[in-house]
């Protein structure tokens, strides 16, 4: 007997709403045993990011190896990776274990909710050419998709063009999150090999508590993939979970800025294989 297990590789958020903390909360709430490898320590709260200390690449590599050699996670999620050396270390390490995990979900964290840049400019090319081709699924929002595709996105046709360009970089599935368009309805678009296969509609929930929503969604998708669901089902269920978490925490005041979602609005016990 064994739990379903996942590994998150990301930065630490001292206020607990995003990053590694949000990933572990999400995976735990969805009944998946979470392990972690920390890439950076951030100094932040709900109002902003005030400092970033990268973890030495050898330590990042060691954390991943320790988990892979012992826990054998079913799926992996990658969030904040800030510099070239860390990205190379992660890529080289994961390539050694490619036959051990089925899915790699990458959330290309580039800018925080408060507007702080979280990926060094010179790291983008290394991220695109080294790490991105290993991904099963990439989950960019509109600004991140614009950076990765090198185009401005103003409508759905632009989203399709961006997804086509991103898919050519080597990632099979691309989920472009349309939340940054505004309006009463939020639509995310899923592409497979550059072709639109489905979209996910959700209501716009009025709240300041949006800190860590991208981390939460990608971790939820990873959790459902860990539990052997197909990509479409995993994303649909993750979207439902995120909406529930936002709704459950929309009126709660944590801090003076963008507060967190309520990850534990409907927690599950750990699932067994």
Predicted regions and their residues:
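Conserved N-terminal subdomain of the carbohydrate kinase-like
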Residues: 2-8, 28-106, 110-113, 264-267
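N-terminal basic/disordered segments at the start of proteins
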Residues: 16-32
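Phosphate-handling active-site elements
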Residues: 31-35, 196-198, 224-238
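Charged C-terminal helix
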Residues: 54, 233-273
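Short, small-residue alpha-helix embedded
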Residues: 146-147, 207-231
